[in-house]
Amino acid sequence: MLEKIGGQIQTPAMMLDAYEARLPSELQNNTYLSRVYHYLRENIPNYSVLNYMVVHGDVNHRNWLVSNNYLYLVDWDSVMVADPALDLGMLLGHYVPRSSWNKWLLSYGMRPSDEALTRIKWYALYNFLQEIVRHYQTGEKREMNAEILRLKQAFGY
């Protein structure tokens, strides 16, 4: 499987480095986004790469396809080997209220330990930053600001 996806292992530190390298200067000067970024940098999950799995890497509604009452995850261009909490963070951070994460994870078949919830939260925050940059780069300022507001409402900081 690693050969099929190019063997791309992505650690949280690598993800933050890539984010920082492509961060537009206007967003670099945003004190709120800087605060979230520094939180992420100071709280990088300590999860062994030996436990990494193949993850989709872009689990959002733009990549969902419903057909005959089945939900399909499409557009596997962002596939990588990473912490499985990456996809969960993207999904839960944007679509499930934090107060429902434990219940959702139990339904998913996962025991919501403090360690797992911390990792999922980290990736949820990271995904918000990624989406904010995406909206900025595509000139979607209204959507970018709405994403910042959702980040503040969901996680504070």
Regions found by a protein language model. Give the residues of each.
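An alpha-helical support segment within catalytic cores of ATP-dependent transferases
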Residues: 1-57, 147, 151
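Hydrophobic alpha-helical segments that form the core
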Residues: 121-130
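Active-site Asp-x-Gly
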Residues: 66-117
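Conserved catalytic-loop position in the HRD/HxD motif
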Residues: 58, 63
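ATP/Mg2+ or Mg2+-diphosphate-binding catalytic cores
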Residues: 24, 133-157
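A general structural signal for well-ordered alpha-helical segments in protein cores
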Residues: 16-19, 101, 129
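Residue-level recognition of alpha-helical structural elements
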Residues: 29, 116-118, 140-144
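Alpha-helical elements of Rossmann-like donor-binding domains used by nucleotide-donor carbohydrate transfer enzymes
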Residues: 35-39, 90, 103, 107, ...
